[in-house]
Amino acid sequence: MQLYTYLYLLVPLVTFHLILGTGTLDHGDALTERRSADATALKPEPVLLQKSSARSTDDNGKDTQMKRIFKKRRNKARGEEELSENAVEFARELAN
């Protein structure tokens, strides 16, 4: 009868140890450090510069991708003055 009592108490502890991979909770929360290290190892590295967000300029230093930016903004972020100043340039780019 005593054997069953010990097994009854021992089985959950062994299972807990096997599931978590380590039984050393008393050494400075080793489980949380290990999990956070594993989680950061699985994160993908950020893309520093995507091709679509790269800007190219012509010889005068003007942005040659204004058409893309203009479509993305849909005229919401521009004032009327800026639109009237660049209307000719936009028309040329749209024609090309």
From Swiss-Prot:
The keyword Metal-binding applies. A divalent metal cation binds at E81, E85, E89, E93. It is found in: Secreted. Transmembrane segments: none annotated. Its cofactor is Ca(2+); Mg(2+). Residues 22-78 form a propeptide. Divalent cations stabilize the toxin the in alpha-helix conformation. Its main location: secreted. Residues 36-85 are annotated as: Disordered. Expressed by the venom duct. The modification Asparagine amide is found at N96. Keywords: Amidation, Calcium, Gamma-carboxyglutamic acid, Ion channel impairing toxin, Ionotropic glutamate receptor inhibitor, Magnesium, Metal-binding, Neurotoxin, Postsynaptic neurotoxin, Secreted, Signal, Toxin. Residues 56-66 have a biased composition (Basic and acidic residues). The modification 4-carboxyglutamate is found at E81, E82, E85, E89, E93. GO terms for molecular function: ion channel regulator activity; metal ion binding; toxin activity. Residues 1-21 form the signal peptide. It comes from the Eukaryota. One of its GO terms (cellular component) is host cell postsynaptic membrane. Belongs to the conotoxin B superfamily. Conantokins inhibit N-methyl-D-aspartate (NMDA) receptors. This toxin has antagonist activity on NR2B/GRIN2B (IC(50)=1.4 uM) and NR2A/GRIN2A (IC(50)=2.9 uM) subunits, when tested on rat receptors. The mature peptide does not contain cysteine residue. Negative results: has no antagonist activity on NR2C/GRIN2C, and NR2D/GRIN2D subunits. This is Conantokin Rl-C. It comes from Conus rolani (Cone snail). The lineage of its organism: Eukaryota, Metazoa, Spiralia, Lophotrochozoa, Mollusca.
